[in-house]
A protein has these predicted regions:
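Short, charged low-complexity linear segments at domain edges
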Residues: 38-59
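Compositionally biased, intrinsically disordered low-complexity regions
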Residues: 18-20, 37-38, 69, 86
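Short, compact, well-ordered microdomains
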Residues: 53-86
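N-terminal acidic leader/helix
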Residues: 3-34
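Secreted/processed peptides and extracellular or luminal domains of membrane proteins
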Residues: 25, 39, 76-78
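General secretory precursor processing signal
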Residues: 22, 36, 73-75
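Surface-exposed polar/charged interaction patches
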Residues: 12-19, 48-52, 66
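Short, flexible coil/linker segments at or flanking structured domains
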Residues: 1, 7-9, 51, 58-63
Length: 86
């Protein structure tokens, strides 16, 4: 994935298409994530972006290898290191 695709992926994962980060009535940040090893939003977004299956699996394996096992862990921990790659 190129840098532009990675940026788009992280934006979409944070949006209503993915984890849906938002403020609740107490102004606290809430989101949805199924935890564990569930990356359903990441997989769906990569598919919708038409990222090849090989490239998507490579990206998701890299996430697993770094301990980013679910969608919210990818957002909380992966964006900076992945976007910083050359």
């Amino acid at each position: 994935m190129n840098k532009k695709q990675k940026e788009e992926f992280f934006q979409r994962l944070e949006s209503g298409e993915g984890c849906n980060f938002r403020k609740d009535e107490k102004n606290e940040t809430i989101w949805r994530c199924y935890g564990g090893n569930d990356k359903r939003f990441s997989r769906l977004i990569l598919k919708r972006m038409k990222v090849s299956k090989i490239e998507a699996n490579k990206f998701l394996k890299k996430c697993d290898d770094n301990g980013w096992h679910c969608d919210c862990e990818i957002l909380f921990n992966a964006e900076e290191p992945i976007m910083g790659e050359k």
